[in-house]
A protein has these predicted regions:
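Beta-sandwich strand segments
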Residues: 24-25, 91-101
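Short beta-strand and strand-turn-strand segments in soluble, beta-rich domains
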Residues: 35-55, 98
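Short, surface-exposed loop/turn segments at beta-strand-coil junctions that are enriched for proline
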Residues: 70-78
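N-proximal low-complexity "stem/linker" segments adjacent to membrane-targeting elements
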Residues: 109-135
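Short beta-strand-to-loop acidic/aromatic patch adjacent to the donor-nucleotide binding site
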Residues: 143-158
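Conserved donor NDP-sugar-binding/catalytic core segment of glycosyltransferases
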Residues: 160-191
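Short, flexible, basic/aromatic active-site loop/helix in glycosyltransferases
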Residues: 179-184, 188-216
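Active-site donor/metal-binding and catalytic loop motifs
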Residues: 232-254
């Protein structure tokens, strides 16, 4: 089994022997399936229903079969117990009826190997943005980043923005979006506050029903555009504590 990184998908090669009296049969998505549970060290379930892997053929008593199992490592990093299990779909898990299953202690590593964040500023150079980036708690990099954050000219991230983004990536989130705070005069702020309400500061939300705006993305992911801002519409974390002041006087945000 390869090293596991929080939130990342991988493949484990598993060899099983049918030590029972009945043939193992998968019937598409039904029948007997191979799956797994992620447990903490006290055997409490962290992720109970892992993806199902059907057997490639019937496995008679006494036979062995090799199966490649798609694993998704849990969040956050730490030490977990990985228990492989067989499930008779819609009926029962074999471990629940006393069948002993293989358990492994697994150290799940951070989602990023190094805390290296780069920034792409979309638009012309801006002194406000440059000053805010220079004041970050965790310095930014130009080479070999683990993740790249996307801003627009005039945006001013808070000093802890880089740290909070890297914390979330280390937890296993490939995409992280900050909270947006409208800047400008009172009228612009009031109007923008209604439009930006879904991205207002607050807690963390892994199920935001809107695209992440001004996202930070691990290598391999690219932003799209939403409301003329860099965005990401896939799975990700809205980090409502990471604040970015967004200019409202620009034509970019006027309707």
């Amino acid at each position: 089994m390869p090293p596991q990184r929080a939130g990342a998908a991988g493949v484990a090669h598993v060899v099983l022997e049918n030590g029972g009296a009945a043939t193992w049969r998968s019937r598409g998505a039904d029948g007997l399936q191979l799956s797994y549970h992620w447990l903490d060290r006290h055997r409490n379930a962290i992720v109970w229903d892992g993806p199902r892997t059907p057997f490639p053929r019937p496995v008679a008593p006494g036979e062995t079969v090799a199966v490649d199992v798609r694993l998704v490592a849990p969040r956050p990093p730490g030490r977990y117990v990985l228990r492989f299990d067989l499930v008779e779909e819609h009926r029962f898990w074999l471990s629940e009826i006393g069948v002993q299953m293989l358990e492994l202690e697994v150290d799940v590593e951070p989602g990023i190997a190094e805390r290296r964040l780069a920034v792409v500023v979309h638009g012309a150079p801006d002194q406000r943005t440059a000053a805010a980036l220079a004041a970050q708690e965790e310095p930014l990099v130009a080479d070999a980043p683990a993740a790249t954050a996307h801003l627009v000219a005039g945006a001013e991230p808070a000093a802890d923005w880089s740290r909070l983004l890297l914390d979330a990536h280390a937890e296993g989130w490939d995409a992280v979006g900050p909270a947006l705070v409208p800047a400008g005069g009172p009228f612009e702020r009031r109007r923008a506050a209604r439009r930006l309400a879904p991205w207002a500061p607050g807690g963390r939300n892994p199920r935001l029903d809107r695209p992440l705006l001004l996202p930070s993305l691990v290598a391999g992911l690219e932003p799209v555009t939403h409301d003329r801002l860099p965005a990401y519409a896939g799975d990700g974390l809205f980090e409502g504590r990471a604040l970015v002041r967004l200019p409202m006087r620009s034509g970019r945000r006027r309707s």
